[in-house]
C-alpha cells in the first residue's frame, strides 16, 4: 500500500477543545466544517461529543452527515440556509441556524414551521462579508421574536483581524458589537480561535474554536496560549528511492533545484494530489528518520524530493514527517506562502489513521 498517511491524534483534539474552555470559561462549539479542516468530521465529532457543547459546520449537508452518524449534539450552520426550503430540514433535525441577511429573516417569517428555531443572529461589525448592518440589528432581533418561530436567539459577529494581536480592528469590532446589542437580552458569541487565544477582553458566552482545535496557531508570531496547543495531524510517508548526484545536477520539473554539492536525494511518496502544497519552495522543512532536512525541487503530483546528504542513516523505507509535532503545519504553510487552514483542508486523497480514541 502507498505509504502516504495522515495520523490523527484524537486525544490532542480533546486537549485543544478543553483549552478553549479553560481560557474562556465559556461554552464552546467545536468548528468541524470542511470535514473538520481535513481531519474527518464524523470521527472528530464522535471523539468530542461526550464533552462538547455543540458543533459548527458550514452548511446543511455537513450537518446531515453528522446526524446520519448518530451525532445528537447541537450543530450550528455557520452560513445559515441558502433557500427557504431548507428550513423544514433544519427544524426536523434540530439544527441551529445563523441568520446573516434580511432575506433569511423574511424567509423565516413567511415559512410555516412545525417547531421553533434556535437562531444565531449575525452582525457585520466590520468584516463586511456577511452579517446584518448595525442599523438593522435591533429590528431584526425584534422581528425574530415577533415571528413566534424562534426558541432562542444568540447574538454573534466574526473577527476579521484577530490573528493580528496589535491591530486596532478587533477592538473596534468589539465596540461596534457592544453598541449594536445594547438593550438586547441574549447570549453572545464573538471569539473564534485567535479570539479565544489572544483577545480575553472580547465578551462571549459561546466561543467557536476552529483552527486551534487541530493544534495549529492562527498567529504569525509566538503567543503564549497558542504554545499550549497540541498538533492533531501528522502527515507522513516514506522514502521510496535514493540516488547520489554530483554537484551541478538538476532535480525535478523545471530544474528549480540544482545540486550545489554532491547531494544524496530521497524521493518520497507525497505530492500535490495528496494535498502537499505545490508552491512549497526549496528549503521547506521535513523530518526524515527523526532528523530535520529540507525539500528540494518542485513538488510533483505524487512525489517530491528531499535532501538526504546530512541524513546518512536515511534509506528506502525511512519514515518522513511533513508536518506534525516536530515540524509544525504553520511553519510549512509559511514557507509555502499560505496558511495552515488551507494545507489541512487540501488533504483529500491521503487515508487517515486515528489514535487516542
UniProtKB/Swiss-Prot annotation:
Source domain of life: Bacteria
CDD domains: PLPDE_III_AR_proteobact
Active site: 33, 253
Keyword rRNA-binding in annotation: no
Gene3D superfamilies given in the database record: Alanine racemase (3.20.20.10), Lyase, Ornithine Decarboxylase, Chain A, domain 1 (2.40.37.10)
GO molecular function, one term: pyridoxal phosphate binding
GO cellular component, one term: cytosol
Gene Ontology biological process terms, A to Z: D-alanine biosynthetic process
Main function: Isomerizes L-alanine to D-alanine which is then likely oxidized to pyruvate by DadA. Shows racemase activity with both alanine stereoisomers, negligible activity with D-cysteine and L-serine, and exhibits no activity with the remaining natural chiral amino acids.
Name of the molecule in the record: Alanine racemase, catabolic
Organism: Pseudomonas putida (strain ATCC 47054 / DSM 6125 / CFBP 8728 / NCIMB 11950 / KT2440)
Source species taxonomy: Bacteria, Pseudomonadati, Pseudomonadota, Gammaproteobacteria, Pseudomonadales
